[in-house]
Every structure is written in structure tokens, then in C-alpha cells.
From Swiss-Prot:
It comes from the Archaea. The keyword Transferase applies. One of its GO terms (biological process) is S-adenosylmethionine biosynthetic process. Keywords: ATP-binding, Magnesium, Nucleotide-binding, One-carbon metabolism, Transferase. Pathway: Amino-acid biosynthesis; S-adenosyl-L-methionine biosynthesis; S-adenosyl-L-methionine from L-methionine: step 1/1. Signal peptide: none annotated. The gene is mat. InterPro entries: AdoMet_synthase_2_family, AdoMet_synthase_3, S-AdoMet_synthetase_arc. Pfam families: AdoMet_Synthase. It is an enzyme of class 2 (transferase). It catalyses: L-methionine + ATP + H2O = S-adenosyl-L-methionine + phosphate + diphosphate. Gene3D superfamilies: 3.30.300.10, S-adenosylmethionine synthetase, C-terminal domain. GO terms for molecular function: ATP binding; magnesium ion binding; methionine adenosyltransferase activity. This is S-adenosylmethionine synthase. It comes from Pyrococcus furiosus (strain ATCC 43587 / DSM 3638 / JCM 8422 / Vc1).
């Protein structure tokens, strides 16, 4: 059965040629990214435990996580958290399997704690955080699950929804993405342990000049004085300047912690490395899209991918798939830009979308007719192998924020 794939030329100014471009990334320690990370960690942990016990992923969606900011008194040399961060795990998961209870809450809380321990080094998970699992219950008869799987080897869409992806990344997008990844890399943290994980990078390109505004939480126990704090800021700037030279020949202006006011004793210091300790709240889906960026110059989906089940939830699967299709087309065909939109219809097989729209801006001297069939084939092959996306997610080969 032929798939509903439409390839067409789109008439628009490529992002690199637009006068103004805005790009944002919320780093792994940002409250919104903490919510995304926990939601996804819980989903993946449930998937693995369901498979271990029953040989199949049972229905769940854990994409409702709220991070409620705590209260802290940071000070140079080391402060304290006086009110813990409250994290609410919500959503739905099968808890009753053939009249036997599955430990949803235990699996979820353990996954959340492990994620936080690995993601935010200076956060004391036992004392700085309260994790409350209110994940709703569901029940299932395994025989009916296996029978349904035999009848429908390709999962049926659980919603009418769309996913969006594009490629390639612009220089500004790459710079914003790689800046946060550098500052939160294991190597950089070993060299500069004072740099916390709550790093937000905002990029603005005007013509051929890029402004990068970086908000980086500095850990108070790692800096004894304002002088040491300012030295860390300088190191951040120097590292990003070197990175920028590798990515772009455009002029790049770098600003770090611009709200600081040394004369009034105002510095961006934290006890834990995240602003969640100081009243900043976070929610799933309020941050980065599946490519790790927030890009108002591009098509975007408003779906929160983190925490959704990787079997049939098109809000997750189609956003990832659209990105993968776009990346393959951009790598292999003569296009300036490609945008992919995939729309499901509830109850229909996820490999048969209502439409897969591929919009391209051909490179100068090329036309869509030259590679229309190739673009179609790339999308068709990914859709035919759509269950690969689930495998990539469970093997931690894909991040969704």
C-alpha cells in the first residue's frame, strides 16, 4: 500500500539568509529540562521493567512532571538549601497485570533519583529534593495484549497529532547547541567544577553578527570569593570563544551572567547548580524540542515528547521520525533546507500516516524534480521501519530534549 508522502518545493528565505535569527537551548539543569529528563527517564525505566517481567512494553505516559522550586541561601564558600525542591510525577501507567501489582511508583521514583544523581552533581537527592509519585493506575490482561500485538504488528496511533523536523542546523543553531553541550560536558566539569548544570544559551544573529547570552549557575561551594567567581566567568567566555571559531566565521559576541552587579554584591551563585533551588519551577514540554533547541525561525511542534510511550504515542514518535527523515534528506540530497511534517490519524497504523509532508528548498541550480523520488524513498523507508525508533529510544541513542 503506497504511503501518503508528498514532496514539494517551499518558497521561503533560507534561515541563514534571513536578517534576524533567534535560537535558544535550556541546559540539562534548567528546571524545564529537569522535568523533561525525569519524565523520559521514568518512561524508559518502566519500558525496561515491563519488558523484563512480561516481554512487552505496557501502556504508559509519564509526560506530566512538575518541578516546584525550593528555597536556598547561597553564599561564597558554600550555602544551604532550606526548602527542598518538590517534584511531582504524574501521568498514567499499567499497575495491575493479570490481577498482580506492578511496582510503578517504586520504578518511577528510583528512575527519577538516578537521573538527578547523574545529571546534577551538587544536588543531594536525599535532602534537597522531595519526589512524589502520583502516577495514575491502569490494568491489563496480558493475553489480550499479545493477541492485539499479533493482530497489529505495527502499533496503532493513539492520537491524531503531528510531528515536525527540519535539517540542516544553521550555524547559530549549532553554536547554541554545542555551547551548552561543551559547558555541561564531563571534561569541562572536571576542569571547572564550579560551573553548574543550569545553563541557558540564547543566540541572536543579526546579519553576520551573533550575540550569545549565557546564563550559567555557579556552585557556591566551588568559589570562595567574588574574584574566583569572576575568574570562572572568564573561563566560560574563553571556552565558548574557541568553540565559536570552529563553527562560524561570523563575529560572535559572548555575554555571561549579564544580571550580575558586583557593586551591589549580586552574583549568579547557587548551592546545587540549578535555579530550581531558588523558586524557579519547571514543566515537561516547556523547553527544547526533540533536536535540543527552541527555534522560532523554524516550524515547530508544541507536543511534549519526553515521557510519552515509545510504542504508539505519535506525539513522540513522529517528532523524532520527522527529524531523522529531514537529517537523511539533508545529508544525501542537494537541498538548502528541508522541513518534514507527519500527521497521524487515531486508530490507524503508525507506518501509514494521514500525510508525510516533505518541503524542500533546493540548492541553486537544482530542482525538486531531480530528487523527488529519492526524498520519497527516504521517508518511505523510515516509515516502513518505524519500530526502529522505539529501539533507538530504549538503547539511549536518542535524546528528546
Amino acid at each position: 500500500m503506497a504511503r501518503n508522502i508528498v514532496v514539494e518545493e517551499i518558497v521561503r528565505t533560507p534561515v541563514e539568509m534571513q536578517q534576524v535569527e533567534l535560537v535558544e537551548r535550556k541546559g540539562i539543569g534548567h528546571p524545564d529540562s529537569i522535568a523533561d529528563g525525569i519524565a523520559e527517564a521514568v518512561s524508559r525505566a518502566l519500558c525496561r521493567e515491563y519488558i523484563r517481567r512480561y516481554g512487552v512494553i505496557l501502556h504508559h505516559n509519564t509526560d506530566q512532571v512538575e518541578v516546584v522550586g525550593g528555597r536556598a541561601y547561597p553564599r561564597f564558600g558554600g550555602g544551604e538549601v532550606v526548602k527542598p525542591i518538590y517534584i511531582l510525577l504524574s501521568g498514567r501507567a499499567v499497575e495491575l497485570v493479570d490481577q498482580e501489582l506492578f511496582p510503578v511508583h517504586e520504578v518511577a521514583i528510583k528512575a527519577a533519583k538516578n537521573y538527578l544523581k547523574n545529571a546534577i552533581r551538587h544536588l543531594d537527592v536525599e535532602n534537597h529534593v522531595i519526589i512524589d509519585s502520583r502516577i495514575g493506575q491502569g490494568s491489563v490482561d496480558l493475553v489480550s495484549v499479545f493477541n492485539k500485538a499479533r493482530e497489529n504488528p505495527i502499533p496503532l496511533a493513539n492520537d491524531t497529532s503531528f510531528g515536525v523536523g527540519y535539517a540542516p542546523l544553521s550555524e547559530t543553531e549549532r553554536l547554541v547547541l554545542e555551547t551548552e553541550k561543551l559547558l555541561n560536558s564531563e571534561k569541562f566539569k572536571k576542569e571547572y567544577p564550579a560551573v553548574g548544570e543550569d545553563i541557558k544559551v540564547m543566540g541572536l544573529r543579526r546579519g553576520n553578527e551573533i550575540d550569545l547570552t549565557i546564563a550559567a549557575a555557579i556552585v557556591d561551594s566551588e568559589v570562595a570569593t567574588p574574584k574566583e567567581y569572576l575568574e570562572v566567568k572568564d573561563k566560560i567566555k574563553e571556552a565558548v570563544e574557541e568553540l565559536a571559531k570552529e563553527i562560524t566565521s561570523r563575529k560572535v559576541n559572548i555575554y555571561v551572567n549579564t544580571a550580575d552587579d558586583p557593586e551591589r554584591g549580586i552574583y549568579y551563585i547557587t548551592v546545587t547548580g540549578t535555579s530550581a533551588e531558588a523558586g524557579d519551577d519547571g514543566s515537561v514540554g516547556r523547553g527544547n524540542r526533540v533536536n535540543g533547541l527552541i527555534t522560532p525561525n523554524r516550524h515547530m511542534s508544541m507536543e511534549a515528547a519526553a515521557g510519552k510511550n515509545p510504542v504508539s504515542h505519535v506525539g513522540k514518535i513522529y517528532n523524532i521520525l520527522a527529524m531523522l527523515i529531514a537529517e537523511d534528506i539533508a545529508k544525501t540530497l542537494p537541498v538548502e533546507e528541508v522541513y518534514v511534517r507527519i500527521l497521524s490519524q487515531i486508530g490507524k497504523p503508525i507506518d501509514q500516516p494521514l500525510v508525510a509532508s516533505i518541503q524542500v528548498i533546493p540548492k541553486p541550480g537544482h530542482s525538486v524534480k531531480e530528487f523527488e523520488k529519492d526524498a520519497y524513498s527516504i521517508a518511505d523507508e523510515w516509515l516502513a521501519n518505524i519500530t526502529k525508533v522505539q529501539k533507538m529510544i530504549l538503547e539511549d541513542k536518542i535524546s528528546v530534549f
